[in-house]
Amino acid sequence: MEDKIEDRSGSRHGRRGGAKEPNGVMVKPKGRGTPQGGVISPLLSNIYLHWFETIAGLAAKAMGQAMVIVRYADDFVILAKDWADGFLQKVESILEERMGLTVNREKTKVLDLDAERASLTFLGYEFRKVRDRLYGTGKRYLHFGPSMKSVKRLCREVHGHTHTRNVLLPVETVVERVNRLLEEWGGFYTVGYPSRVFRKVNHYVLKRMARFLNRKSQRYDRLKYADTYYGEMAHYGLYRLAWAKTARRRI
């Protein structure tokens, strides 16, 4: 990094900078590396991965290995139809011996997406091979959509907004908060095949809003504007996830 930054005192200060934990405690780097969440970590990750991608690309070309590296921040995957003998060992050698990094072998794995039930989770998406059932060809194609981890995190946030502790809030306020959450989350998944997951999320959100209205029933009539919860939420403009970008709408 000092080869690229003219003010070396600034780079040294950045490496020594710590990271503040949620409880307010400052964590300082000890020995090698920087604390996760430190201000310099994303910059260092991009610098190292840039050179790794360059060096690994040259090594792959020399070994006749066709591959593509996809990276974001400090995370990356290497995609290939097959592996040349010794290429994976070469990748580890580049990272550890040439670049001085440590490969976390617990988080590093080789996946064969052609294997049954194999899946790759990357940047909130889950990639897996599924069989075609619509046209009856039986062929497998690459399916990708929201990961289960992302869906569970979203549902936890929806649960928090519709929790009993918020029962004194106006329905409009809760709907506005849930809508904002759904719009931001759904906007990230405008590619792929998220329709099945979207339907499940819509059902969960409607169920949570129905329970929220039930808890307020002692304070006013449970359903004011319709005979069903779906109709009631349509009146309040509850957001509904839909696959097509132009079709995502409020109920």
Q: Which positions does each model-derived feature cover?
A:
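Non-catalytic terminal/accessory segments
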Residues: 1-251
